Amino acid sequence: MNIDRFKHQHVEILNGIHTLRQLSHQGIADHAVDIAHELQALAQVITQHLAIEDRILYPSLESSGNDRLARMSASYQNDMKGIANAFIRFARQWGNAALLRRSPEDVRTAANTVLKNVHARMMRENREFYPAIEAL
């Protein structure tokens, strides 16, 4: 199974997280417009990535005839629901520059949790899930 598109989206997601971290370190209030823009762009990539996984990747793996990959796929899909929901709530809540300026420390606290979880998930997929798929 060719998963190059998924891997490319992981690079985009990880780069987006890195950019948000850099902007946050430079000052949330001072870079609120850029942070809101980057967060919206990241949300778009993540939303698209999740939709493609749900419509194509997970169903393909679950019907692949490979029990190990089918179980792994179901587990990853289930695990991602909580991470995805938290990220979507975060992006909706903090995708506005005025709100970012008003509550920079609240943004930082939420971002440290949500973005850390998304980052960890991408790294885990890159390390465990995608190599297993490519070995098919």
What are these regions (language model features)?
Residues 1-136:
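Small-residue-biased structural context
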